[in-house]
């Protein structure tokens, strides 16, 4: 397959709540409808996939990972790895966190890929899949098995297999059968993974993790195709690596110390090695350079993924915050380089290996067929036991007849050869008269025998001529084969009828499903139509609501001065202007109360709004464009996690413009002058606060809606947790029920064994009593013998020894019987123990079922609660819409309220004459509040500017440090080049001196005498050696100066990294300068306004002419500023604490769910171990029961000896298999040459074989060669007599020997084809033929088939009798030939599992 570049995706996470609170700017944006990303002002990068901050997990998976899963099923290796700085969302994207406590919408890549893989497996029923899982962690450059924590790090090694793939030796691979098994292993591994808390991330990954899924797929059946070729099942093993890299860290930001600091060093070193590999592979200038895979273990593990044979996707996660600008820029640069890396994916399918597997599978089938054949023969012999002698006699007679006929044919062949030889000899050699007479008698006798054989005998039609004689055995064999094949055909017909019935049932089910699908399609269309109508209505209502909200916002922002009647000046007096009032920051995400003015209500209610559809959509598009820019400038994040709840996002997106309009234009409606004069007038206050109460009601509805949404999310988490626990409990209950069944079964076996052993105990007790009696009698006899005085001392000693032996034997027997009695009692008590354990397990199962019932009840309650919350949210949304639509109707009350205010002013104007003073007081308060707001905003801008300046100073200092280091390296490079040039000059001068000395020495050598010539020649040789060494030094120095290789490779690489770091810092400084300039320009304008306001303040305060008021006002002003600033800081801290509390609660929930999951997993593993123990106990009891408790030790010893023998056989067969695999190519090449020979014979007009039959015989050649190899290795077994007549001999020499001269011509007998063979070939063919049964005539040489003219070959008759294909017949015949040998099946002859 051709090389393809790896796919690179970039995902931008949204701003975190903490970043939003601290007003971090967004420096990374994606360009909509393109695969480009902008960082800073003008840096644009293009990638294969770009996902913005609103992207969902499903979008990332379906776009990037789903094609990789399909490639995995096809047989390719795949890899996905997440790259980026710490806290950028890598673990969240990959899905390596707490998977048990995550809702379905937020699941990462790994859970979704697992579900996709098992769905693909269920869709391929014709393929047998085996899934294995491993989970490895690279922590501090040490490998760690997360699925087997007891495995030592020293036992895990990175190696390369015979195919060049990187593997981890010693890692545990767990075979799984369902999604739940994989998720359980993933959860176990995630719980054991190293994580920690830093200042940048609460759940920071402290190691690299690699989760590998291995898929092995094998075809379930292998059948012959219609064209006669063998259809081999493919054996494919593919792997999918999910790599979660640890993020790059900076100690200044993370604040790591101690152990965390050491972890950061190791993480950064591994990522640096990975960056070097990406640079070496992705930089076209470094194509020929060495790729440093061995610098770190993570790069060694990713060798196949980067520049190897796998399909790879790299997901780069970046942070949009301006504080992470340089890290994001470096990550994007590495991702851009990675796009130049090219892999060469290869399919993990080897036809040669699969051919070997196919052959091993065929051997297995043949052995099974042989065993079934032998079983049928044994069954037939059992059913017809009375006819066995007759059948054996008939069988022996048939074998004798076949042997005699074969001998007859052999003699006949010899006679024919001798006849031809004597005919030639008669003409060539002169014989005497007596010899000629004997030869003539022999010729006449031979002719008479021929005529007698050719003449048909009366009453015997079966042997009518010479042709039928040698073929009698063939007819018998063909009849047997025909009967056997008819039985096989009948069995196949039964299978075919069953399959047809199943197919008919499936067709009927498909028809029913098609009808159901049609009905569903009709109902779906109707539902879509209704949904479309409802959506159109909702869109129209929402457009109307948005239009009204914008009108209200416009009215609130205009704030016109209204004229009112004053109390002292009559109806033409003007009311004071509305005073802007700063509202406190609300704790519920910035919702403010907005109270419109009275004139706005008049304008809104003057006429009902009527809009055309075009105007509505035009306004909607305009508002959308404005809102997009506004949202990008002032983005607000309401929760830290990525949200897949589209309804929530829509509702929040609709609320954001209104929230901001209220926060920026919040105006409190002041009371009139009369309200300041008389505060006891409740009627006027109620009328003026009518709309205020309506807005407060709207605010409370919004707060309740947010609270309900939060409750809804919590309810979803609880529901998912309960469902997960229910699934786990169901599995545990099922496993415990199976364990109870095993315990009951073990108890029953134990009871039967205990009954058996109770009888045995009584028997043993009786034997023990007898042994004791014998012992006492023997002691008495011994004492009597010692008491007697025997004259023969030798006899006495002999009798004493015999009695002592008897006593020792009796004591030993008593001890053995007592031990057996104790063992029998222990076995008898086993059933009681099993009953106790079974009762305990039943109680445990009842408890689990009770928990399941409680969970189901809780699940129903949570479902009802969720439904209620959904209804409340919808009801609140409806109420909000109604309040927004009916807001204009309340404005009709304002004229009435305004008249009431005027009446109250007119009524109160008599007693009070200081209305102007009150108005001035209101104006002063309003003015002071405005000045306070200006100063606060000014101070906030100044603080942000100071922060930006500090960040810029830090970046500049870092840049200066890098520049210093770069200048140091450049100076070193310059000094080195100067030193090299100086050395070159010195070497050149020295070379010139050496040339002069050599010339002088050569002259001296010519003129010097013979004695001095030796010394001078030695000096000349030394000078020449020095000259050559200096010449090499000068060449190396010149080469370094020419190519600029002054520094070491490490220093060159460091210089390259410094240049890149300086470039990134310059870009960050440029971005900071731009933001600082913007802030400075805004501050300049605000400073000007502030200076003008200060002059106005001074003028107004001077006009007051009261020193006390001036001092009070300044104190009040400073106090208000300090209080407001402290309040703002308090609110900021409060929100930060709330976020931390929320994060801690989420962490506690995750840990609790993980703990519960691990507890259930431990219980499950314990149950499995108990079940295995009970099965072993059953096997042990079965052995006790079968062997009656005797010979257990002997049986175990036999088993151990057998295991050792099998291990030896296994080693031998492995070696033999390797040798046969190497020698497999030779028979294939011989078969090809043999086919060419047959084709040449066919072209010559022999009529020996056609190409189709040649292909058939080539298959038989392979089987014959394999059988011969087995025989030569000394592993041949004896031939089974029951099926020896069905064997197939090898055709290697027989067919090749037959040529055009093998057929009889003009009645003469052809010479023997054995003359064409060498002596070695004859010996080998003869030995192999003797090891086989008598061959069928159709496979004999052509000379034995066509000895007379006009006789057709027997193979034509065989083809007419056969009703199956030639290939299948050949395979079955070869299977019978290869399967007759009683060779014990070993593990190597089973299909290997890789």
Swiss-Prot record:
Looking up SMART domains in the UniProt record yields: KISc (SM00129)
Compositionally biased region (Basic and acidic residues) = 571-580, 1267-1280
Specify where the region named Disordered lies, as residue ranges: 551-583, 642-664, 1267-1340, 1375-1394
Name the Gene Ontology molecular function terms of this record: ATP binding; ATP hydrolysis activity; microtubule binding; microtubule motor activity
Query: Quick check: keyword Nucleotide-binding in the entry?
Result: yes
Locations listed in the record: Cytoplasm, Cytoskeleton; Cell projection, Cilium
Q: Describe the location of the Kinesin motor domain by residue ranges.
A: 5-341
Tell me the Gene3D superfamilies matching this sequence: Kinesin motor domain (3.40.850.10)
Binding-site residues, ATP? 84-91
Q: Which GO terms describe its cellular component?
A: cilium; cytoplasm; extracellular region; kinesin complex; microtubule
Name of a matching Pfam family: Kinesin
Q: Where is the composition biased (Polar residues)?
A: 555-565, 1281-1295, 1310-1320
Coiled coil (UniProt feature): 352-418, 493-554, 709-980, 1010-1078, 1118-1152, 1187-1226
InterPro entries attached to this UniProt entry: Kinesin-like_fam, Kinesin_motor_CS, Kinesin_motor_dom, Kinesin_motor_dom_sf, P-loop_NTPase
Query: Among its keywords, does the record have ATP-binding?
Result: yes
Disulfide links within the chain = none
- Modified residue annotations for Phosphoserine: 643, 646, 672, 675, 704, 999, 1365, 1387
* Record note on quaternary structure: Interacts with STK36.
Q: Which family does it belong to?
A: Belongs to the TRAFAC class myosin-kinesin ATPase superfamily. Kinesin family. KIF27 subfamily.
Per the entry, what this protein does is: Plays an essential role in motile ciliogenesis.
Descriptive protein name? Kinesin-like protein KIF27
Please give the organism.
Answer: Rattus norvegicus (Rat)
